[in-house]
Regions:
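Single conserved hydrophobic/aromatic residue that forms the stacking wall/gate
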Residues: 1-12
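Conserved His + Asp/Glu catalytic blocks
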Residues: 13-15, 19-24, 117-127
C-alpha cells in the first residue's frame, strides 16, 4: 500500500493545473468580479448572455458529482455568493445558475464552477 500511496501522490502533485487554478493563483489574468477565501467570481470569456459570470471554489473539485460531505460548506457558500453578486449587479432576481457535470453535459474545465447567467430571456428547458 505504501508504494501505491507514493505513486498516487506523485500523480496528484504532477498533474497540470486547470485554467481556473491558474486564475486563482494569479498566474493568468481574468476579470475578477469578487473574491474571498473560499471562492472567486470571474467574467466568462465566452459569454452566452449579457451577464455571464463563473463562480469557482478555490478548492479543486473536478465535478459536482465528485463533491463529498466535507464539501457541503463550500457548495452552500457558492450559492450564497451567487445571490450576493446578483444583488450587487441589480439583477432583480432574474438570473439562472447552471452547473455542467461532465463533458457530455458541456463541462469544458474540470474544476467545479457555477454559471450565473442574466440579461436575456432564458427559455425552458435549457439546451
Amino acid at each position: 500500500h505504501g508504494e501505491y500511496r507514493r505513486q498516487r501522490q506523485m500523480c496528484i502533485r504532477d498533474r497540470s493545473l486547470t485554467l481556473f487554478e491558474k486564475i486563482i493563483n494569479k498566474e493568468i489574468p481574468a476579470e475578477i468580479i469578487y473574491e474571498d477565501d473560499v471562492s472567486i467570481v470571474i467574467e466568462d470569456i465566452n459569454p452566452q448572455a449579457p451577464t455571464h459570470l463563473l463562480i469557482i471554489p478555490k478548492k479543486v473539485i473536478p465535478k459536482l458529482s465528485d463533491a463529498s460531505n466535507e464539501d457541503q460548506e463550500i457548495l452552500g457558500h457558492l450559492m450564497l455568493v451567487a445571490g450576493k453578486i446578483a444583488d450587487q449587479l441589480n439583477l432583480d432576481e432574474t438570473f439562472r445558475l447552471v452547473v455542467n457535470n461532465g463533458a457530455k453535459a458541456g463541462q469544458s474545465v474540470f474544476h467545479l464552477h457555477l454559471h450565473l447567467i442574466s440579461g436575456r430571456p432564458l427559455n425552458w428547458p435549457p439546451g
